[in-house]
Each structure stands twice: as structure tokens, then as C-alpha cells.
Amino acid sequence: MKRVMLYFGSFNPVHKGHIALAEYVVEQGLCDEAVLIVSPQSPYKRAAELAPEMDRFEMAERACAASRLPERIKPSVVEFLLPKPSYTIDTLRYLTENHGAEMEFSILMGADQLERLDGWKEYEKILEYPIYVYPRHGEQVGRFAGRITVLEDAPLQDFSSTEVRGRIERGEDVSQMLDAGVAEYIRRKGLWSPAARKAALTAQIAAEPENTELYTERGKLHYRLNEWGAALNDFNRVLQLDDSHAEARQYAQMVQEKLEFRYKDIYNP
């Protein structure tokens, strides 16, 4: 029977740390194949944070193909085909019912996911599967002792997908974090560029016109791009909705100072 380890995640984007973990579990003989289950939309994440699902899958496909074990590390679209929202137990149940005769499934997850596991749908059923957990640097994993296996010597990277997205948005180098094919795909598609991020936030604001955090995030993006007028408009909108919003007030004051300095008439102080 083939042993298949399922690595669930949004992979937004997939980075070298994800692939290093997949290579590790295969090379350590913990499974015959590692499969990256690309989530269409996490029940615990805002939809606006995610790149389109097929973009995330294609990046995962490129990263897996460039791994040391391309025949044994693969991505899957199975959760794209199941009813939404996507929950881990539903995917496990579907795979077991349809492939359990020839495959034995286990799960790979991070210690941060394990900490939240008891909030997941039917988490006790999930614990019936073998679970392998990779801790963060220097972290002790104490939850569900005896029901999980901690991978103490798993390879860990000092960055996350969140950091990768932030660096892309700021135009910083990500070559040490991403496979070259993934980086090229992101550049070609314009994923997580400032323009793409602004468009996503604007669409989300249209759907949630009183969400102060969305205006704040877009305002900070305008601020980083030196778009002072647009930034001030967003921060003022936040203060209209919530006069006690300290972060928006601080940013609005900083923008006002920049505008006053820029347009001050030095001949008529």
C-alpha cells in the first residue's frame, strides 16, 4: 500500500521551505509520496489575501517539478473540486473513501496549526490519522502528546509566505526564498505587486465599505508608495467610521506633515 503524506496549505506562494519539508519527509522514509494539497480558500483566512487558486497551484507545480524528488512530490487540486468551504476532515474523508484501498494517508503540519487544531471541524477525527508536526525554531510542542510525531530535526526556514509577499510588494529580492520558476511566474503574472494589491483591496472595500482595516491597509500601501493624497483619503475615511482608531490617526498626521512640508511656501513662512 502506498504511503501518502498530505501537506495542506494555501501555498500563497509556495516557497523553498515548503519544498524542503516535503523532500525531508520522503527522504526520511516517512512516506512514499508527499502531496501538497493547495487550499482554494481557508476557512480561517480572508479571501482577499489569496492569489487565484490556479495561480497558486501552478506555482506549486513548478516548485514540485524543480524539487530533488519530482516523481514523489506533487501538488493536488482535490480541494478545488470539493464543496466549499474547504475543511481538512472533508478532504481526508473523500480521499480515504475513494483511495483508501490502495493508499494510506498521513498529515504534515506546522506547530502553529497544531495549536489551533481543536478549533477545526471534527478535529478528533483528524487525530485518527498519523500526524507529523514540524516545530518552529526552539519551540516545544506539547499539545496532543502521544497522538502526534514531532519532527525535531526537520529543515526550517526563517521566512514565511507572508514575508515573501511583503518583500515582493516592496520590490525586494526573493531569490533565496523562491524557486526560480515560481519567481518568474510571479513576475509575469504581477502577483502581489502594489497595483495588484491595491486592486484586491479596492474590490474588498467595495464589498465591505465599512471595514476600517481594509481602508487602513490600503492607506498604508498608498503611504509606502508616496501617494499622499490617496493615503490621507483612506485614513480620514477610517476616522469617519471609527474616531478612536489610533493607527489611522497617527498615519493621517504623518501624511499631513509631509504635505505641509512639501507645499510650504518658503518665501512666505
Name each model-derived stretch.
Residues 1-197:
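Nucleotidyltransferase catalytic core that binds NTPs
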